[in-house]
Structure formats: structure tokens, C-alpha cells
Amino acid sequence: RLCIPYIIPC
């Protein structure tokens, strides 16, 4: 799954 720090947590 996509993870983007501060936007989409892992």
C-alpha cells in the first residue's frame, strides 16, 4: 500500500 509521510500513514 502507498505510504506518504504526514499524509498517508503506512
Swiss-Prot record:
One of its GO terms (molecular function) is growth factor activity. It is found in: Secreted. One of its GO terms (biological process) is positive regulation of smooth muscle contraction. Keywords: Amphibian defense peptide, Disulfide bond, Growth factor, Secreted, Vasoactive, Vasodilator. The keyword Secreted applies. It comes from the Eukaryota. Coiled coil: none annotated. Disulfide bonds join C3-C10. This is Signiferin-1. GO terms for cellular component: extracellular region. Induces mouse splenocyte proliferation and guinea pig smooth muscle contraction through binding to CCK-BR. Expressed by the skin glands.
